[in-house]
Amino acid sequence: VTVTSLPQPTLPAPSEEPLAEDVILGVDTHKDVHVAAVVTVLGVLLAHQEFPVTAVGYRQLLSWARSFGALRRAGVECTGSFGAALARFLSRENICVVEVNQPDRALRRKHGKTDAVDAEAAARAVLSGRADVTPKTGEGPAADMRVLRLAKESAVKARTQAKNQLKAVLLGVDPVLREALSDLSNTALIATCADLPDAGDAAVFTLRLLARRIQQLTVEVKELARRVTKAVRRCRPQLLDIIGVGPDSAAALLIAAGDNPERLASEASFAALCGVSPVEQSSGKTQRRRLNRGGNRQANAALYRIVITRLRRDTRTRLYLERRTKQGMSKREIIRCLKRYVAREIYGQIQRASALGAPSAAA
């Protein structure tokens, strides 16, 4: 009997290097140092290390974390301040960055408060799914508008303070000068005080100094407002076509949405971001909701200004006010409803422009 052996299939050679295990990075951010911790997908803490807040320190942190396995996700605290630069660096390295806001209170009560514990808690928040918010990119037109509005608000506040100081000093000057300036408008008063001669009197010198400071701050406010308007027109010009929306309100809402508005899952998430969504406060047989006092308060204030403008100028809004008033709602409650409607409209315009690819803004 002839026995014919069958050909044996060729098996692939065994891999010399096993696949790297997935790990998760958590970072507790500070001004001068970042503390990082690495955990496995099973929740085992591998190590924690401190790194300087420099470009070299960021690269060292990434290399250190990758030495433990395949790094695909990272939880970073304070992505809008101390952790902003690190979050951008990790995103450019194709790592999914998750914003971690609130610490794990149970873990803090159990292990105390240290930077290493906070870094570990950030990693575990990503692992458990408790932290799932995509941070703002911090690069683009919205980031430009944020710093411009920051400088503008600071200049407006300083100008108001200088005006109040000028009028306070004016009360104690020579009666003849005070009577000559008392009937002038604010603009004329500032212009006149800026041209007062230096007669050696401390009060007169202070009036002239404050008036010139106000004039300089006014120039700054106008220039910053012009740049904000230009940024909005180049980024989302369609927002300015909405009734009641001006450049400053549009900028506040765009800053809240960020340069990556696709991170917002729905208009409800945008409403919650702006603090115009009710919060459930039910228990047992009691079913109720309370006012949302969280969210971005500048965006909330922008929605309020838009609603107030519409109540004065928009026929549809005034008809809505009349109808809701007849139903027994107070004006404050009606304004809250209108703010939610405006947030829905703004969200649609932002997402529509984002899908079409809005142009970037130039400063």
Q: In which residue ranges do the predicted regions lie?
A:
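Charged, flexible boundary elements
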Residues: 1-18, 222-223
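Gly/Thr-rich phosphate-binding beta-strand-loop-beta motif of the actin/hexokinase/Hsp70
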Residues: 18-40, 122, 155, 252
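Short alpha-helix plus adjacent loop in nuclease-associated cores
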Residues: 91, 97-137, 143, 147, ...
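Phosphate-backbone recognition surface of nucleic-acid-processing proteins
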Residues: 241, 247, 251-331, 360
